[in-house]
Swiss-Prot record:
Binding annotation for FAD: 26, 48, 56, 100, 407, 414-416
Keywords: Electron transport, FAD, Flavoprotein, Membrane, Mitochondrion, Mitochondrion inner membrane, NADP, Oxidoreductase, Transit peptide, Transport
Organism: Saccharomyces cerevisiae (strain ATCC 204508 / S288c) (Baker's yeast)
Cofactor: FAD
Molecular function per GO: ferredoxin-NADP+ reductase activity; oxidoreductase activity
Compartments in which it is found: Mitochondrion inner membrane
Name the record gives this protein: Probable NADPH:adrenodoxin oxidoreductase, mitochondrial
Positions with a binding annotation for NADP(+): 177-180, 223-224, 235, 414
Extra remark: Present with 1600 molecules/cell in log phase SD medium.
Length: 493
């Protein structure tokens, strides 16, 4: 463990100091851009509440999508280059295991740094706000569920998951139809197909529990219609292609028929989606294009199903005598003539779906830091109030030297590539301001000598051990699942 005082000082070079709160893609891409593009010397420190870096890339990406995590290679190369003593212009430090606002106050960063960038992402959940949503066994948010199967130390051994009776889960409901909802559908409907999951970095504890679930049916429930689906074609295709394992996709004809959609009114991506669905809904031998006939279903036919369900609003989560979910009450919706964002509920037409597990995938929500109110930092619903990345006060004025990037700046939307673009744009504004800002004080220091934390070298030790554990288990990586395991992973080689 490293217990050192970080001092941004050099006898030869005056470096301006930048602190970034959060080590996920937005934080690391911001650091990368600053270190690669700044014409003036910088000392950049990333602060992370977990002992390990990479945030949503490490804990939010589907285990069977390792290519999405390629950004971690870029971050690692950057960290190694700029934390090396041989780099004379810029310096980089990683400080893990410290929560800004707790062990170190945000005000302390603001008082000791030339710029502070908040890139800590969205750590809350958007809610249904219906009876039964809270406290019902077998009801989880997508954020909780994804963090659990990805081995996040806050969730990996959470008793809500480990004590849940997965052997009773046959029917699943998922509220939402974005990419995260499709990821979760894929995990659940193919939970017993070892060739998909056994070599990934999915938590072995979670996978062993999921394997107990005899999942037969997953229903993705959306308030609006097919046109307003939030998923991408790539994610949807992956679900359709599970048919080779006997997994069949379904859409009720009242929600989808090719003739419903005039190609001249939609973009190319949507028209491809229509073609994809219309082809995959046909029997395998009746499909017209080879692209949709990659691998036939087994001769025994289909025994598991997922379904895209539309124009429904959840009204109530119903429990059994033991406090576990047993059904979901919903009503039909209809869209206004102008296809407005708010569908109209038909509360006189209520139905009930039998479900053994319910995942709410409504999006992640940003949460303000505890000091925001005291420091008069503006917060707008689920993200930090800002003007092109420059944070605003509660009264709408620019807060000096304080910035935001990523989801906490704009809300939980977009993929890692769009997060990168946002981080670069904010990084450019930070550089613009630093270049014209006043003279740097000769010594800016934050004393960490008595605070337990990890460094980049500590992460390298943890990383090496996780990869070695994974190799022994025939996986790409076997993550440490608790804070205790992560801290212990720092010791030794």
């Amino acid at each position: 463990m490293s217990f050192v005082q970080i001092r941004h000082i050099s006898s030869q070079i005056n470096r301006k100091t930048v602190s970034i709160v959060g080590s996920g893609p937005s934080g690391f891409y911001t650091a990368y851009h600053l270190l690669k593009k700044s014409p003036i010397p910088l000392n950049v420190t990333i602060w992370e509440k977990l002992p390990v870096p990479f945030g949503l890339s490490r804990y939010g990406v589907a285990p069977d999508h390792p290519e999405v995590k390629n950004c971690e290679e870029t971050f690692t190369t950057c960290a190694e280059e700029f934390s090396s003593p041989t780099n004379q212009k810029h310096k980089f430090s990683f400080v893990g295991g410290i929560t800004i606002g707790k062990e170190i106050l945000l005000k302390e960063l603001l008082d000791n740094q030339d710029a502070v960038i908040l890139s800590y992402g969205c750590t809350g959940d958007r809610k249904l706000n219906i009876p039964g949503e809270l406290g019902t066994k077998g009801v989880f948010s997508s954020r909780e569920f994804v963090n659990w199967y990805n081995g996040h130390p806050d969730f990996a051994k959470d008793k809500r998951f480990t004590d849940f009776d997965w052997s009773k889960v046959s029917k699943v409901g998922i509220i939402g139809n974005g990419n995260v909802a499709l990821d979760i559908t894929r995990v659940l409907i193919s939970n017993q197909i070892d060739e998909i999951w056994e070599n990934t970095d999915i938590s072995s504890l979670a996978l062993n529990l999921l394997r107990r679930a005899p999942v037969k049916d997953v229903k993705l429930i959306a308030r609006r219609d097919f046109v307003h689906s939030k998923f991408t074609n790539k994610e949807l295709r992956e679900l359709w292609e599970l048919e080779k394992y006997g997994i069949r996709g379904r859409i009720d004809p009242k929600f989808f028929q090719k003739e419903m959609f005039d190609p001249s009114k939609y973009d190319r991506a949507f028209n491809r989606r229509v073609e994809m669905c219309s082809e995959y809904l046909k029997p395998f031998n009746e499909r017209s294009k080879k692209n949709y006939k990659k691998a036939p279903p087994p001769s025994s036919g289909y025994d598991k199903f997922w379904e895209l369900d539309y124009l429904k609003t959840p009204l109530k989560i119903n429990r059994d005598d033991f406090g576990a979910i047993n059904s979901l009450s919903l009503c039909n919706n209809r869209l206004n003539e102008d296809n407005s964002l708010q569908p109209l509920k038909d509360v006189n037409n209520i139905m009930t779906y039998k479900v053994d597990l319910l995942i709410t995938s409504l999006g992640y929500a940003g949460v303000p830091m505890p000091e925001f109110s005291k420091l008069s930092i503006g917060f707008d619903k689920d993200h930090i109030a800002n003007k092109q990345g420059r944070v605003l006060t509660s009264s709408g004025e620019i807060f000096p030297h304080l910035y935001a990037s990523g989801w906490i700046r704009k809300g939980s939307q977009g993929v890692i590539a769009s997060t990168m673009q946002d981080a670069f744009e904010v990084g450019d504004r930070v550089i613009q301001d630093l270049v014209v800002s006043g003279a740097l004080s000769l010594e800016n220091s934050i004393d960490l000598s008595n605070i337990k934390h990890t460094t980049w070298k500590d992460w390298e030790r943890i990383n090496k051990k996780e990869l070695l554990r994974g190799k022994k288990e025939h996986k790409t990586r076997s993550k440490f699942l608790t804070f205790e395991e992560l801290w212990n992973g720092v010791e030794g080689i």
